UniProtKB/Swiss-Prot annotation:
It comes from Rattus norvegicus (Rat). This is PDZK1-interacting protein 1. The gene is Pdzk1ip1. It is found in: Apical cell membrane. Its main location: membrane. It comes from the Eukaryota. It is a single-pass membrane protein.
């Protein structure tokens, strides 16, 4: 078996290399650069799309909008009695338009080191 593999290796070493690829001509350097930039931008767009769909976070049930019973209490035009349920969690008891500063849970806070 060793002799057969050595014979095949020797034959492959003696055979002249094949030149199978004959191009129609070399592209101009500016055309090569343009093609390289286009391919790079396509790859970046694909990476952004994959990142967007792959790393998409599920919406928390507490962050959805809820409808209240009284439409006359609507604050914003176009909201028609809707409010964010997140705002009701830290609304102040002292004044109806004041809010408390609530500490966030450690796992939910995103921060970047400087």
């Amino acid at each position: 078996m060793l002799a057969l593999s050595l014979l095949a290796l020797g034959l492959l070493a003696e055979v002249a290399p094949a030149s199978c690829q004959q191009g129609l001509g070399n592209l101009q350097p500016w055309m090569q650069g343009l093609i390289a930039v286009a391919v790079f931008l396509v790859l970046v767009a694909i990476a952004f799309a994959v990142n967007h769909f792959w790393c998409q976070e599920e919406q928390e049930p507490g962050s959805t909008m809820m409808i209240t019973g009284n439409k006359a209490d609507g604050v914003l035009v176009g909201m028609d009695g809707r409010y964010s349920s997140m705002a009701s969690g830290f609304r102040s008891s002292e004044h109806k338009n004041a809010f408390e500063n609530v500490l966030e849970e450690e796992g939910r806070v995103r921060s970047t080191p400087m």
